[in-house]
Amino acid sequence: MWDNATTMMVVEGIFVTLYMTLATTFMGYVLGLPMGIALVITAPKGLRPNKIIYKVLDVVVNVVRSFPFLILLIVIQPLTRIIVGKSYGPTATIVPLTLSAAPFIARMVESSLLEVDHGVIEAAQSMGANLWTIIWKVMIGEAKTSLIVNVTI
């Protein structure tokens, strides 16, 4: 059906797409996971309420999520050039893809962590667990299934 050159272009396109998708997913979680955790922790009813940090993160997540990708691609082109060295190509596209994916991931992480029963968190606090133990062992441990399901989205 296809000649050899067309087949090679399709195969190359598949690998480039996989590269961009996997790199964006990884980098999106590197940025989005801490943002989602911070949103839960600093929320008004969180473990360490902080109105300023919560509001700033909330606004950043909402604003970036509402930006159309092509506009974001153009707006952060100088940043992409600084990070990658050029503003075109698959590697350069990962930067705006990551910056647009991270807020979505942050909201999914926030949603997953908010599903954790508050009684479990209170039990950990009453046993003397520190903040990091509560975050990593209790909250993320309890929300692990939901977080893994969210990776597929």
Tell me what each language-model feature is.
Residues 18, 22, 131-153:
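Transmembrane alpha-helices
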